Amino acid sequence: MCMIEHIPELVKAGVNSLKIEGRAKSAYYVAVVTNAYRRAIDEYLQNPDGKVSPWIVEELNKISHREYSTGFYFGTEPGQVYSNGGYVRDYDVIAVCEEYADGVATLSQRNRFFKGDTADVLEVGNQPYSVTLNDIYDKDWNPIESAPHAMYLFMTQLPLPTCGVTPIFVFSLPVRSAQCELRSIK
């Protein structure tokens, strides 16, 4: 179920809290969904006649999810999607920020990436943005081409976050798999 494009209806119905459904959702999933809905609600409150920003919908399509519907909210079919029980997963989390100081982010690798990859960065309360990982270093500031294994700590320079709080950066890349390539060909 995805109601991001129906925030006006939810507000007018008196809904004052939302719940993320499902078991074993990742921290990345929760961060993206929470950020997206917070921004969509804020946009609606600032401009009740406007539409949700396209980037918000795009972000929800990047996280691992089953095919979206509005469920039974509008009382129309299909309330439940049966066409494919599998998950849509086009992006992988590649790193999570463990520490940030003086323009340097210390990151913990989650999935494989390489120097020169362009990654999306999720920052609390803001629209995600892209950075190219041109310069990555090990903990001793030796240049590296990629982090060699999961949970490996590495560093890169990043612009000062705009969120005004201790940043939580999550980096994601399009999935590099035969499944993703097949999906894009169709």
Question: Where are the predicted features?
Answer:
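Surface-exposed amphipathic alpha-helical tracts and adjacent flexible/coil segments at the periphery
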Residues: 1-175, 180, 185
